[in-house]
């Protein structure tokens, strides 16, 4: 497949060698001072061929979607009724996935988002890190992410065969679906794909910050049993 352009940049990976730090305290200086393994990479621009990529094969998918409400939200607009116990019992027996929806609120001026082809990023290149929620004073900042003391995260280690992609000049009517987890484990279906923002050298000096929204969705495939 031929892409119209590519970006030469560096991505920060988790170090593959040395002592393994298995826990981070979120929102603290220590989390930002952790060791990194910075590697030069090529990121391909899929603009014009974005329809080639799908969630179940590559782990990500670009879509067009015009939203009536982009820049503002109110609590009443996002509240949903709780499901019944019967519905919950049914869903627990079906295939399920976690899919993030990322979209810009304005045209992206800098620091675009890149995703890796799930087939090129092997399980051995992923490291599970526990993100611990900071003290009680700051915990409220993480209430939307967890009601507990923290949560697990996967960080990537570098491997030469990894392939990265992005779509240039994304607009608010364009969104990126990113698969974070899929219970279907058949050896063919993409189960997760790493993603990261990156510095495009051509827009490094742009002062306007990127404004974007990321929504995490719990998806149930009611026509497919839990494998």
UniProtKB/Swiss-Prot annotation:
GO terms for MF: oxidoreductase activity
InterPro entries: AsaB-like (IPR044053)
EC id: 1.-.-.-
Conditions for induction: Expressed during the earliest stages of maize kernel infection.
DNA damage among keywords: no
Annotated metabolic or biological route of this protein: Secondary metabolite biosynthesis
Description of the deletion phenotype: Abolishes the production of hydroxyaspergillic acid and leads to a reduction of ferriaspergillin analog containing hydroxyaspergillic acid.
Keyword field contains Ion transport: no
Keywords of this entry: Oxidoreductase
Family, per entry: Belongs to the asaB hydroxylase/desaturase family.
PANTHER family for this protein: BLL6449 PROTEIN, OXIDOREDUCTASE AN1597
Biological function: Hydroxylase/desaturase; part of the gene cluster that mediates the biosynthesis of aspergillic acid, a hydroxamic acid-containing pyrazinone with aliphatic side chains that originates from leucine (Leu) and isoleucine (Ile). Aspergillic acid has antibiotic properties and was shown to be lethal to mice.
Protein name: Hydroxylase/desaturase asaB
UniProt organism field: Aspergillus flavus (strain ATCC 200026 / FGSC A1120 / IAM 13836 / NRRL 3357 / JCM 12722 / SRRC 167)
Phylogenetic lineage: Eukaryota, Fungi, Dikarya, Ascomycota, Pezizomycotina
Gene: asaB
